[in-house]
Swiss-Prot record:
Compartments where found: Cytoplasm
Highest classification ranks of the organism: Bacteria, Pseudomonadati, Thermodesulfobacteriota, Desulfovibrionia, Desulfovibrionales
Main localization of the protein described in the UniProt heading: cytoplasm
Family the entry assigns: Belongs to the EF-Ts family.
GO molecular function per UniProt: translation elongation factor activity
Entry's Gene Ontology cellular component terms: cytoplasm
Highest taxon listed in the record's lineage: Bacteria
Alphabetical list of InterPro entries matching this protein: EF-Ts_dimer_sf, Transl_elong_EFTs/EF1B, Transl_elong_EFTs/EF1B_dimer, Transl_elong_Ts_CS, UBA-like_sf
Protein name from the UniProt record: Elongation factor Ts
N-terminal signal peptide: none
Organism: Nitratidesulfovibrio vulgaris (strain ATCC 29579 / DSM 644 / CCUG 34227 / NCIMB 8303 / VKM B-1760 / Hildenborough)
CDD domains with a match to the protein in the record: UBA_EF-Ts
Length: 287
């Protein structure tokens, strides 16, 4: 069967593979389009295996929130270069992986198949990274923020007491701003009572020993350490942080103001923040 230019064009549109690869696939498969698609996929899988040892230090964090704000997911999709991370197909796949995490709780085999397909198309090693699912039972809403470069993504569970509040524009804007706060300020916990006690003890001991080394009197060392811990809370606890859009207001005060505006009692239950590469940095620090 003669392979025409229109057949090559059609296969390219379906697979985004190179023109010569498409022509060869059609020749190998007797001009049968579906078989040619599979042939290219198989070739892509072979390429993927060869590329599997290459580092995937670039990529994106995919973010998905359901229309009702009750279910959400984050998913890292890694690649080798920043150029590929900005490719439309790569960005689209990151979003689809996040949606699968939101609806199923984890990535399944179809996710790896999709990744292998895009490896064949774009010619770089890729892989999935961390994932996180968030669900809201009852009233409330999941706010989200995805940084413009796709390297930082946040989910935050906002609480309220009235079902109608979750549809209020003022409440939704507050949820978005709190998520943006988390992205920018990287808090360790929502509030002081949710900070890991071991972290608090470590901070207290660091400042206590520092005060002793500076020759401070023993009777004020504890006060110095406690003062330092309070300062630490203002930096590490979301509710105590200065609001990024008005540093004279804390996030807790923002919630109070918004609560009054919507006639409800608002709060933050939890959050998840992913920054691409931070897991690798943590592993290096632990070595």
């Amino acid at each position: 069967m003669a392979i025409t230019a229109s057949m090559v064009k059609e296969l390219r549109e379906k697979t985004s593979a190179g023109m010569m690869d498409c022509k060869k696939a059609l020749e190998e498969c007797g001009g049968e389009m579906d078989k040619a698609v599979d042939w290219l996929r198989q070739k892509g899988l072979s390429k993927a295996a060869k590329k599997a040892g290459r580092a995937t230090s670039e990529g994106l964090v995919g973010c998905f929130v359901s229309a009702d704000g009750k279910t959400a997911g984050l998913a890292e999709l890694k690649c080798e270069t920043d150029f590929v991370s900005r490719n439309e197909k790569f960005v689209e796949l990151a979003g689809k992986l996040a949606e699968q995490v939101a609806t199923k709780g984890a990535l399944d085999e179809s996710a790896q198949t999709a990744i292998n397909d895009i490896i064949a198309t774009l010619g770089e090693n890729m892989g999935s990274g961390r994932t996180a699912q968030m669900n809201v039972a009852g009233e409330g809403f999941i706010g989200s923020y995805l940084h413009s470069n796709g390297k930082i993504a946040v989910l935050v569970e906002m609480t309220c007491e009235k079902a109608a509040t979750a549809a209020e524009a003022t409440f939704l804007e507050c949820a978005k701003n709190v998520a943006m706060q988390i992205a920018a300020s990287n808090p360790a916990a929502v509030s002081a009572d949710k900070v890991d006690p071991a972290l608090i003890a470590r901070e207290r001991e660091v400042y206590r020993q520092k005060a002793l080394e500076e020759g401070k009197p023993e009777n004020i060392v504890e006060k110095i350490a406690e003062g330092a811990v309070k300062k630490f809370f203002k930096e590490a606890c979301l509710l105590e942080q200065p609001y990024i859009r008005d540093d004279k207001t804390t996030v807790a005060e923002l919630l109070k103001q918004t609560s009054k505006a919507v006639g409800d009692n608002l709060g933050v239950a939890r959050f998840v923040r992913f920054q691409l590469g931070e897991d690798a940095a943590a592993e290096e620090a632990a070595e």
